[in-house]
């Protein structure tokens, strides 16, 4: 785009100089009509060539009627009726307007790309006897890299030596440095602030976090909002209609009114064509959406397309998963309650049985056990999502899960009076007791729910946990609806039923962790995943990604989406209103060709300023 801006700027500058020479020459010298035509034709052809080039590109896309055709017809017609100066002036101002449009789009994209240009140029690969600089693209998993202070992390990796603090602002929008040590995951695009780190490569450069984020932002243009489609569809019908109107202005008045001069009405018709150019309408809508996506990315919120940005502004209901979304998802063992074995045995067997599970509860059980897991002691393991698992540990048959799982297996299990999640355990066909797990509500969840309530947005929670735990969380956060005890597939069905029974044209947003909620994220109008940093599942499944586990970012995203839509609507109303006014004035001869183009440029610039202002101060 930089080359295109430079080329257009040179064309406009050259044409402007020749236009001034032509005006001065025709004003101070007695020139024949043919000579006047020649000196004005040169700057006109320079700019007309650029217009024809744009028109030809659109023709290849089967788009004939556009602003390029209107200005070409109008200015060529002005030449035909010997209005050379006005024809060149109109074409010059039109091309300057297109140049400003290109510069605005280029700068907006550049600001996003600059912010997202987080891929380093090199990596320090550790080799025998030292290190060597290589392109990040040459790195492979399991190789060891060295990251020095002030260098960017080249690829996703895990720290094997050293400790440091990282600046992750480009990825997460979070200004607080992040401390890392041996065993910490580090993500491409972060900046090492202090110590020297050695890290083992986890992913190739193309699959690392920075590259995937940049690709996602770059492809956001491909998903267009309904308002963008409306603007394009409107101009598709608008342009041929105003072309016909301009022709009728040239033809009908001389036929209908006695004494009407054919030449004067032809000129008015040409002005109508110039006044009808929809440049201000076309540029302001996509630029506002592009700016909105860029503003959100600077807040650590990645939006995959303008259609999702628009949908978010219309969201009237937010559905939240409980574990890891409204709660911290960092479980703690509150109590070990054995029946037929010792507490130590119950915890040890359960930790071993859960050794291969990725569920947060499994991690809390292993953490509570606190010792290394000898996987040689573990035999066959079979998971039942939403219920529990079967495992063989030390030759003993374990069945570990929730109350539903115990019911399925036919065990008489102990009812739990305390609030929390009970993990029941059976050993060799005999109920052995339960372990009570607790979670805590996120600090920012309460603030988010209060804000949503003020905005008259409904808040719903769905969870696979039991009703008592779910009701306790709902009571703390004052949720509107709660659905508990749901299997993963039942969550999708519950969201579908809620949309059918409670909603009409409103949009529903689902907020989850992006790992276990992919089906629900896909089914909702807007799928929002938390903790996208380092989560492949979140980057793939969600429409909007919060790069940090921070629910307050949702407030920022909603404000930006509403500000964007407000700017788009204001721009559309203003642009269409000004077009109607200009067409009326042009029809009655109150506007010259140059003034019509200047008015269109003014509309475009006002809309651009409005878009930037609204996005800077969304609410």
Regions found by a protein language model. Give the residues of each.
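P-type ATPase nucleotide-binding
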Residues: 148, 333-458, 467, 476-495
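Bilayer-spanning, highly hydrophobic alpha-helical transmembrane segments
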Residues: 14-17, 229-258, 268-289, 569-598
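N-terminal membrane topogenic signal
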Residues: 1-14, 238
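Conserved ATP-binding TGD loop and adjacent catalytic N/P-domain core of P-type ATPases
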Residues: 395, 427-570, 578
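Actuator/coupling domain of P-type ATPases
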Residues: 22-23, 40-122, 126, 140-145, ...
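Short, hydrophobic transmembrane alpha-helix segments
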Residues: 22-36
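Conserved catalytic phosphorylation-site environment of P-type ATPases
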Residues: 72, 171, 267, 280-353, ...
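Transmembrane helix interruption/hinge and helix-loop junction motifs
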Residues: 29-33, 79-87, 258-259, 587-595
């Amino acid at each position: 785009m930089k080359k295109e801006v430079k080329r257009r700027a040179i064309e406009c500058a050259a044409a402007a100089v020749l236009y001034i020479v032509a005006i001065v020459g025709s004003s101070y010298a007695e020139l024949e009509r043919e000579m006047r035509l020649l000196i004005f034709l040169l700057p006109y052809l320079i700019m007309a060539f650029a217009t024809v080039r744009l028109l030809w590109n659109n023709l290849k896309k089967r788009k004939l009627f556009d602003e390029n055709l209107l200005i070409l017809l109008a200015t060529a017609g002005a030449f035909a009726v010997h209005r050379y100066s006005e024809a060149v002036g109109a074409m010059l101002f039109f091309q300057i307007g297109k140049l400003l449009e290109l510069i605005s789009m280029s700068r907006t994209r550049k600001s996003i790309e600059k912010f997202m240009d987080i891929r380093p140029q090199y990596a320090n690969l550790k080799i025998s006897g030292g290190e060597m600089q290589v392109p990040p693209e040459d790195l492979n998993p399991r190789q060891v890299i060295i990251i020095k202070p002030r260098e960017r992390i080249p690829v996703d990796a895990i720290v094997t030596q050293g400790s440091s603090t990282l600046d992750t602002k480009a990825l997460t929008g979070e200004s607080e440095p992040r401390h890392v040590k041996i065993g910490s995951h580090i993500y491409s695009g972060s900046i090492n602030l202090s110590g020297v780190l050695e890290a083992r490569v986890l992913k190739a450069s193309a699959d690392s976090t920075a590259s995937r984020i940049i690709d996602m932002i770059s492809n956001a243009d491909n998903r267009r909002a309904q308002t963008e489609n409306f603007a394009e569809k409107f101009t598709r019908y608008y342009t041929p209609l105003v072309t016909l109107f301009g022709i009728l202005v040239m033809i009908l008045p001389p036929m209908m009114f006695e004494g009407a001069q054919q030449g004067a009405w032809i000129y008015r018709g040409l002005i109508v064509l110039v006044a009808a150019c929809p440049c201000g309408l076309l540029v302001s809508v996509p630029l506002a959406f592009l700016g909105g996506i860029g503003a959100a990315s600077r807040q650590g919120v990645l939006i995959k397309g303008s259609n999702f940005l628009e949908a978010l502004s219309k969201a009237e209901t937010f559905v939240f998963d409980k574990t890891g979304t409204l709660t911290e998802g960092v479980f703690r063992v509150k109590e070990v309650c054995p029946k037929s074995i010792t507490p130590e045995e119950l915890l040890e067997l359960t930790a071993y049985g859960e050794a291969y599970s990725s569920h947060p509860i499994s991690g809390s059980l292993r953490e509570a056990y606190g010792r290394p897991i000898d996987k040689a002691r573990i035999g066959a393991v079979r998971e039942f999502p939403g219920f529990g698992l079967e495992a063989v540990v030390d030759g003993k048959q374990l069945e570990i899960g929730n109350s539903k799982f115990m019911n399925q297996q036919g065990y008489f299990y102990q009812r739990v009076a305390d609030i929390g999640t009970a993990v029941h355990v059976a050993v060799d066909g005999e109920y052995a007791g339960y372990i009570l797990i607790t979670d805590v509500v996120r600090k920012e969840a309460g603030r988010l729910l209060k804000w949503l309530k003020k905005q008259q947005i409904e808040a719903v929670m769905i969870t696979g946990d039991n009703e008592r735990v779910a009701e306790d969380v709902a009571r703390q956060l004052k949720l509107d609806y709660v659905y508990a005890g749901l299997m993963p597939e039942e969550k999708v069905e519950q969201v579908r039923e809620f949309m059918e029974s409670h909603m009409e044209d409103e949009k529903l947003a689902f907020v989850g962790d992006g790992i276990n909620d992919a089906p629900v994220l896909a089914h909702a109008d807007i799928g929002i995943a938390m903790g996208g940093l380092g989560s492949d599942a979140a980057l793939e499944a969600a429409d909007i990604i919060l790069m940090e586990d921070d629910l307050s970012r949702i407030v920022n995203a909603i404000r930006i989406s509403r500000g964007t839509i407000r700017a788009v609507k204001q721009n559309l109303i203003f642009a269409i209103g000004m077009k109607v006014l200009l067409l009326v004035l042009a029809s009655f001869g109150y506007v010259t060709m140059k003034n019509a183009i200047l008015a269109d440029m003014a509309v475009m610039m006002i809309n651009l300023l409005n878009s930037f202002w609204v996005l800077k101060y969304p609410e």
